[in-house]
Amino acid sequence: MTNTEVGKTTRRARIERRTSESDIVVELDLDGTGQVHIDTGVSFYDHMLTALGSHASFDLTVCTKGDVEIEAHHTIEDTAIALGQAFGQALGNKKGIRRFGDAFIPMDETLVHAVVDVSGRPYCVHTGEPDHLQHNIISGSSVPYSTVINRHVFESLAANARIALHVRVLYGRDPHHITEAQYKAVARALSEAVKFDPRFSGVPSTKGVL
C-alpha cells in the first residue's frame, strides 16, 4: 500500500456504550475539519470536549445520557471510555501515521505539556496539577464539574485508545484555565500523532505492528 492509498483510508468510528449508569453514542472522524457536536448533560465537560475535537481538527459527535442526578462522575468517565474506544477503532491498522505527538499549550497564567505515543501499550502519566484542583468545583448552567475527574478522563481515554499519554501541568492557578489547557494540549498532541507521514507507508514500529 502506497502512502497515497494510506491517505485515502477512511478513519471513522461509531461507538455505542450502554450501562446501568449511562447511555453513550460517540462518532469520530480523525480526518475531519473540527466539526463538533457535544451533549453530555454536563455543560463544562461539553465545553472541554468541544475544545478537544476542535483543536484536534477531528469531527466529533457525542451524545450522553447519564445519571447526573446522582453526580457527573459516571457520565464524564464513561464518555471518556467511549471516546477512547472510538479513537482506537478509527485508527485502524495505523499504517503511515507519525505515531508520536506533543504540544505545549498556554492559557493566560497556565502552561501545559502533553505527549502521545500511539503505541498499542496503554499508559497514562498525569502530573503537576495544584493541590486545590482535588476539591475544586466548576459550576456551569447544568451539572457541576469536579476537577478531580481530570486524571480519570485522561486515564480512561489512554486505556481505551491504547495509547501512552503524558499530561504535565507546568504551572497555573485558575482551575478553569488549568483544565482547559490540558484538554487542548491533548487535542493537539493527538492531532500530530495521527497525521500521515509522507515518507513512510508502513506501521511506524520496528516490530511491524502496534
From Swiss-Prot:
Pathway: Amino-acid biosynthesis; L-histidine biosynthesis; L-histidine from 5-phospho-alpha-D-ribose 1-diphosphate: step 6/9. It comes from the Bacteria. This is Imidazoleglycerol-phosphate dehydratase. The gene is hisB. Belongs to the imidazoleglycerol-phosphate dehydratase family. Its EC number is 4.2.1.19. GO terms for cellular component: cytoplasm. It comes from Mycobacterium leprae (strain TN). Keywords: Amino-acid biosynthesis, Cytoplasm, Histidine biosynthesis, Lyase. It holds the Pfam family IGPD.
